[in-house]
Amino acid sequence: KPAAVAAALALSTALLAGCGSTAASSDSVAESTAVSESTAEEAEEGDADEVAAKNCADLIDAIYVQERTDDTDAQCEAAKAAWDALTDTQKEMVESENADPEYFGRDTGDASKDDPRNEDEIGENELLVVSFGTSFNGSRAADIKGIEDALQAANPDWSVRRAFTAQIIINHVQARDGEKIDNMKQALDRAVANGVKNLVVQPTHLMHGAEYDEMCEAIDEYKDKFESVSIAEPLLGEVGADATVINEDKEAVATAITTEAVKTAGYEDAAAAAADGTAFVFMGHGTSHTAKVSYSQMQTTMETLGYDNVFIGTVEGEPEDTACEAVIEKVKEAGYTKVVLRPLMVVAGDHANNDMAGA
């Protein structure tokens, strides 16, 4: 095809040369043919770049799914191999619904500092820490691993293990970094195979949302495989009927995060920050689940504790009273001129880095 294009362009040039000398026409044709062939080669190279980039994007889309299959390991390996084979120019062209150059190219920290905690032969007592997960290596090592390490230190007679509920994240980490993290089914199957008798499940979820419900459903199918199974409450405890209902868990969290935020900002207490015109906004993920009232309850808790300059917001904008626009209006109406923005999330991953820090 490129040769045919070159010949056609050369013929057109010869015809346009008109009644000039034969030598001139021949030189013109030769020169035009050379230019045309070069253009055709560039076009061919451009097509090859697009094909290679699209192939990589398609392979990323194939592993950007919430269900693990028998082909997942091979698909993760194929996606990474396709990425590694691309030139820098081709990598910038990787684009699809779920794929972009940052999927493999973004530096999120050193994965070797993390620990997937999927060893076998662990004894009869297992403490399974269940998290949504994050593909940000630094955040995963500092936040999720940090929690797991603390639980292991506090419970030396138990073996702490890990499970993520987001298969999309598990696949991302496996494809990019070669780190294999168990999903719920894998973790529970591993516990059974290891002869675990007593299983305690500690979620790192913030509330009784969809992820917590799905976790409980998965565990329910394995209850007869162990002598005892216990599931801990999420961080904010029980949900409660409406926005006015608060509990000790929410009070403890509200006090802890506000105290740390105030200290980090350089104030003696929240009142001193308020006097200086500073407000604190804690941003949660947000959810359409009925547990979304937990965010409103956290706002009620802050007010009950006297933290009038502390506001609760959500990235996803649910419930409506915690949407960014609503929180901004509250801060303005209260007259604060400075705002300290902090995540109300277990992990400072994608939302904290992109939606908050990148806003």
Language model features by range: what are they?
Residues E102-V340, M345-A359:
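Extended amphipathic ligand-handling, pore-lining, and cofactor/metal-binding catalytic surfaces
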Residues A14-G18:
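C-terminal motif of bacterial Sec signal peptides marking the signal peptidase cleavage site
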Residues E44-D107:
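Beta-rich interaction/scaffold domains
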Residues C19-V29:
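Bacterial lipoprotein signal-peptidase II cleavage site
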Residues D27-A48:
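Post-signal peptide N-terminal segment of mature Sec-exported envelope proteins
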Residues K1-A6:
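Bacterial Sec-dependent N-terminal signal peptides
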